[in-house]
Each structure stands twice: as structure tokens, then as C-alpha cells.
Regions:
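Flavin-dependent oxidoreductase catalytic cores
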Residues: 1-81
Length: 81
């Protein structure tokens, strides 16, 4: 359950350097969570390298899972989803 109805919708942050979650991206979403939103969503991501539209865009692949887990755990630590 969300703690409230405030949701930060996905927007292109341009913080996925090397197409992987960066510390800057984690810090940004952590700050949003700390600010009280119920849920924050990370920007759109490519599911294949050929789907990348921009530098700084997430590319979903196995090796970025630890970075996404770090971001998720940090957001959850402040009560957001």
C-alpha cells in the first residue's frame, strides 16, 4: 500500500551514465522519497541496445540489476515505493 496518493511520474532524468543506474540517479530518487511521495518511478528504459534513444537512458540487462536494487532499497528506506 502507498503511504499517500502523491506519485512522481517517470521523466527522462539523463542520469544513467553508461546506460546503467548512477549514484546521481539513486540520490535523486532517494531525495524524492525523503520528500514524502508515495511512489517514484524511474524514467523509461530500453529493453534492447537497439532501443536506446539517448545517452543517459537505462538499458535493461542483467548486469544493472544490482544498481536498480540499490536504488529501490534506498527509496524503500524512506517509506516510498
Amino acid at each position: 500500500m502507498l503511504r499517500n496518493r502523491v506519485i512522481r511520474s517517470a521523466a527522462f532524468e539523463n542520469m544513467a551514465y553508461g546506460n546503467s543506474p548512477s549514484q546521481e540517479l539513486t540520490d535523486y530518487h532517494t531525495a524524492v522519497a525523503r520528500g514524502g511521495v508515495g511512489m517514484t518511478t524511474v524514467a523509461y528504459a530500453a529493453v534492447a541496445e537497439s532501443g536506446l534513444s539517448f545517452d543517459g537512458q537505462l538499458w535493461m540487462r542483467e548486469e544493472i540489476v544490482p544498481g536498480l536494487r540499490k536504488l529501490t532499497d534506498s527509496v524503500h528506506s524512506y517509506g516510498a515505493k
